[in-house]
Amino acid sequence: MRINPTTSGSEVSAVEKKNLGRIVKIIGPVLDVAFPPGKMPNIYNALVVQGRGNEQTNVTCEVQQLLGNNRVRAVAMSDTDGLMRGMEVIDTGAPISVPVGGSTLGRIFNVLGQPVDNLGPVDTNTTSPIHRSAPAFIQLDTKLSIFETGIKVVDLLAPYRRGGKIGLFGGAGVGKTVLIMELINNIAKAHGGVSVFGGVGERTREGNDLYLEMKESGVINEENIPESKVALVYGQMNEPPGARMRVGLTALTMAEYFRDVNEQDVLLFIDNIFRFVQAGSEVSALLGRMPSAVGYQPTLSTEMGSLQERITSTKEGSITSIQAVYVPADDLTDPAPATTFAHLDATTVLSRGLAAKGIYPAVDPLDSTSTMLQPRIVGEEHYETAQRVKQTLQRYKELQDIIAILGLDELSEEDRLTVARARKIERFLSQPFFVAEVFTGSPGKYVGLAETIRGFQLILSGELDGLPEQAFYLVGNIDEATAKAMNLKT
């Protein structure tokens, strides 16, 4: 792990004023800066614009192109309002560096690693540059292992890979935020791990709502901030494209420190990976590059790869990434989502139909997929159980039109039995969440994989055909369902 001892690129006081340039051109968030001969900054170096006189401007930019004639082209990480030609620019001599370590937990940062939550400065001297190479092959942990989440529907039907990448698909109001918070809570309790949330180009209101909900559910501990389980990094919709393009790397850098130095399992959330591509497209156009297919940047695959390849398992720890994927106009062949899919190990699809039925988490058991669901990885027992659950639910789905028109009585005895078991399975896939206790009043449940498999095997075998289906709704393991059935009878 390469640690850079300098402070954040925006803090001019810590930078030796040895390499000065001047702004010669400003086009929106893009600046052209002239430097003395032989003093050209490197690509990705952070430049800081100095205000004139006593003005505190401190706009940080990142070098993107060397133009010749001792000029560089840089992209600003904040608004360029008030900047003028002739202003002094300092080359910090290093990429943007952000604070890392335990003191980042419970705090909100911007792309430069500056806290934006009005809780004062971050208590750390350890910073790390946001541009780093992916781990070498020899450092990687190539063993395929399941990342147990304690959420039945995920662990059984679309299991996550330790150090893998998961795409999270779902519209507004189907429970994305609650699922994300439950995963943050469970990784802290079951794996002793931490989480980093990168808000990339989404609404400021949503970022604020997430922060308040995390405080309410205890994921962020207001009384004792260092006891929190998550660090938040935001680069929202209103920020320049440079900030939105780099905020994902800031979040990833914080996650890498927990993996490489603290040797922890880390969950990295990116919401939304499409906005990362969109920001890169804007920057590419501003830099004058020829657009590629559908107007995207010609470097789309390279940019996506440089982010995704750093998200992996090493011999020290793992970064498991869950990425919300916006699909523009529901076109899965659009270059942005299509490039993302190439990197994903699993997809978790949230269904509005299940949410309308009150089944939470509203994960669609038939649409969600995982490359890990293979007998040689999860074992024959897990694989067979998952396949039988999917077959039962698929048959129920096929019969729903007949049931709607003719009713249950017109079905064969075998199909009626399938429908009854499918309805029990559908309800047993629901689960009370720890982070939702404050809303539901039901205590949260973490269900181990072995318990999950046992429960579904009992339903499929027909041993529980005599129990009412409401006994399976919002319970943890199968023993709770049988106990609930006894209570319903009395």
From Swiss-Prot:
Which of the seven top EC classes does this enzyme belong to? Answer: translocase
Q: What Pfam family is a match for this entry?
A: ATP-synt_VA_C
One GO term under biological process is:
proton motive force-driven mitochondrial ATP synthesis
Q: Which reaction does it catalyse?
A: ATP + H2O + 4 H(+)(in) = ADP + phosphate + 5 H(+)(out)
Provide the binding site for ATP. Answer: G170, G171, A172, G173, V174, G175, K176, T177
**SUPFAM superfamilies named in the record:** C-terminal domain of alpha and beta subunits of F1 ATP synthase (SSF47917), N-terminal domain of alpha and beta subunits of F1 ATP synthase (SSF50615), P-loop containing nucleoside triphosphate hydrolases (SSF52540)
- Name the GO cellular-component terms: chloroplast thylakoid membrane; mitochondrion; proton-transporting ATP synthase complex
The record's listing under CDD domains reads: ATP-synt_F1_beta_C, ATP-synt_F1_beta_N, F1-ATPase_beta_CD
In Gene Ontology terms, what is one molecular function of this protein? ATP hydrolysis activity
In the bilayer, the protein is annotated as: Peripheral membrane protein
Give the Enzyme Commission number.
7.1.2.2
Enumerate the InterPro entries for this protein: AAA+_ATPase, ATP-synt_VA_C, ATP_synth_F1_bsu, ATPase_a/bsu_AS, ATPase_alpha/beta_chains, ATPase_F1/V1/A1_a/bsu_N, ATPase_F1/V1/A1_a/bsu_N_sf, ATPase_F1/V1/A1_a/bsu_nucl-bd
Cellular location of this protein?
A: Plastid, Chloroplast thylakoid membrane
Task: Tell me which UniProt keywords the record has, alphabetically.
Answer: ATP synthesis, ATP-binding, CF(1), Chloroplast, Hydrogen ion transport, Ion transport, Membrane, Nucleotide-binding, Plastid, Thylakoid, Translocase, Transport
Task: List the PANTHER family.
Answer: ATP SYNTHASE, ATP SYNTHASE SUBUNIT BETA, MITOCHONDRIAL
Quaternary structure, from the entry = F-type ATPases have 2 components, CF(1) - the catalytic core - and CF(0) - the membrane proton channel. CF(1) has five subunits: alpha(3), beta(3), gamma(1), delta(1), epsilon(1). CF(0) has four main subunits: a(1), b(1), b'(1) and c(9-12).
Summary of the function given for this chain in its UniProt record: Produces ATP from ADP in the presence of a proton gradient across the membrane. The catalytic sites are hosted primarily by the beta subunits.
NCBIfam families per the UniProt record, alphabetical: atpD
Family per similarity comment: Belongs to the ATPase alpha/beta chains family.
- The name of this protein is ATP synthase subunit beta, chloroplastic
Q: Which organism is it from?
A: Ipomoea setosa
